[in-house]
UniProtKB/Swiss-Prot annotation:
Function: Main aspartate aminotransferase that couples nitrogen assimilation to aspartate synthesis. Has a weak, but significant, side activity toward kynurenine (Kyn). Oxaloacetate and 2-oxoglutarate, but not pyruvate, serve as amino acceptors, while Asp, Glu and Kyn serve as the best amino donors. Essential for axenic growth and survival of M.tuberculosis in macrophages and in mice.
UniProt-recorded name of the protein: Aspartate aminotransferase
Binding site residues for pyridoxal 5'-phosphate: Y69, S100, L101, N189, Y221, S254, T255, S256
Enzyme Commission number(s) of this protein: 2.6.1.1
Family: Belongs to the class-I pyridoxal-phosphate-dependent aminotransferase family.
Organism: Mycobacterium tuberculosis (strain ATCC 25618 / H37Rv)
Length: 435
């Protein structure tokens, strides 16, 4: 029954029942974690063959001695595999070390210090400051980069086919201080939304007041399907070039959630001008990436189909966990109508919206009973969710029994926070004080 249809007395009685359920959670002495989208040990085990590669044969197919310096672009064979997966030409893709987030950080830093290919000056010299558009809910570590660098962040609502492009077009057309936008175009974090072709076309084609506006295209979940189908990649570089804005997209990806989260390979894609620009400055801090690690990945995968087959093994582990979360949330929260949640077809997260004004309270209640959940508001710039309703759930790391207990407990906390808030708002002013 919807909470809206309850009398004050019924709401008070329901609140008392949720208090009893919460007290039972307190007695369980839980220690459960839903915070980060980390691969489980079972998933990491899928890649253990990497630990014995490349063995004594340290040369790649081109004859490069991977043990030595050099090779800033990365190994051609591995670049070819991920160029196919990402829909990018090989010359437009370079392979780096383990962290695509590091690439993003460096490119923002390089832009601040030196300016980009189309920049009239270094961003740090812009008198009116720098602004970034941030689709919300979004990736907290993206927002941490721009916040650390003193870049103003503007939230953009996320729709079913991507961010609100009407609003984006309106903003970028008149404000030259808007230099970039964070994007996760496939199976977004945490929304699960995949940008439509039309959304991508408009983003690369739109007129911007800043000549050096950039799309930070974080394709972190390009092959991370929860079904048996892989998403079709939109050729963002090709569309941008056709629109006359070849330098607009910076494309990022990595194997962090494909092989070893701390020992994978990152990728940066862009126009040939952007590739040369990046390497010009990256070459000052490193003489080349870890090519031995790239070689082991090349041999482990073999080709793009090898990556796809590997990801279907991940899918077999992850899909039941995501289905379990949806099942528990449906059982516990559907009738009350105080929450909604995504059921993504890929990626690593579920976005849960609870009763507005109760997300922080829900997370605090969960923490007090030993259920760790990502901080409420983390998916928004400056950690400020204006509606205080969004909670990110990461199902990948816990075991299935722990995941069930954690989500069930989180649902109890959401229900308790909702009845508590409704009573305190005076929507049931005649209800007894049961707090």
């Amino acid at each position: 029954m919807s909470f809206d249809s309850l009398s004050p007395q019924e709401l008070a009685a329901l609140h008392a029942r949720h208090q009893q359920d919460y007290a039972a959670l307190q007695g369980m002495k839980l220690a459960l974690d839903l915070t980060r989208g980390k691969p489980s040990a079972e998933q990491l085990d899928l890649s253990n063959q990497l630990l014995s590669l490349p063995g004594d044969d340290y040369r790649d197919p081109e004859g490069t001695d991977t043990r030595n310096y050099g090779g800033q672009h990365g190994l051609p064979g591995l670049r070819a595999i991920f160029a196919e997966l990402l829909g990018i030409a090989v010359p437009n893709l370079i392979a780096g070390n383990n962290s695509s987030l590091e690439l993003m950080h460096d490119i923002v830093a390089f832009s601040m210090l030196y300016g980009g290919v189309d920049s009239p000056r270094p961003w740090i010299q812009e008198q009116d400051g720098i602004k970034f558009l941030c689709p919300v809910p979004g990736y907290d570590r993206h927002f941490a980069i721009t916040e650390t660098m003193g870049i103003e962040m503007i939230p953009i609502p996320m729709l079913q086919d991507g961010p609100d492009v009407d609003l984006i077009e309106e903003l970028v057309a008149v404000d030259p201080a808007i230099k970039g936008m964070w994007t996760v175009p496939v199976f977004g974090n945490p929304s699960g939304v995949t940008y439509s072709w039309e959304t991508v076309r408009r983003l690369v084609q739109m007129r911007t007041a800043a000549p050096d506006f950039r799309l930070f295209w974080d394709n972190a979940y390009a092959v991370h399907t929860l079904t048996l189908d892989f998403p079709r990649q939109v050729d963002v570089l090709g569309l941008a070039a056709k629109a006359g804005n070849p330098n607009r997209p910076y494309v990022f990806a990595s194997t962090s959630k494909i092989t070893f989260a701390g020992g994978g390979v990152s990728f940066f894609g862009g126009s040939l001008g952007n590739i040369a620009w990046y390497l010009q400055y990256a070459g000052k801090k490193s003489i080349g990436p870890d090519k031995v690690n790239q070689l082991r990945h090349l041999r482990f995968f073999g080709d793009a189909d090898g990556v796809r087959l590997h990801m279907l093994r991940h899918q077999q582990i992850l899909a039941p966990k995501f289905a379990l979360v949806a099942e528990v949330l449906d059982q516990r929260l559907s009738e009350s109508k105080i929450a909604s949640w995504t059921e993504p077809k890929g990626g690593y997260f579920i976005s849960l919206d609870v009763l507005p004004g109760t997300a922080r309270r829900t997370v605090a209640l969960a923490k007090d009973v030993g259920i760790a959940v990502t901080e409420a508001g983390a998916s928004f710039p400056y950690r400020k969710d204006p509606d205080d309703k969004n909670i990110r759930i990461a199902p990948s790391f816990p075991s299935v029994p722990d995941l069930r207990n954690a989500v069930d407990g989180l649902a109890t906390c959401a229900l308790l926070a909702a009845t508590e808030t409704l009573l305190n708002q005076g929507l049931a002013s005649s209800a007894p004080n049961v707090r």
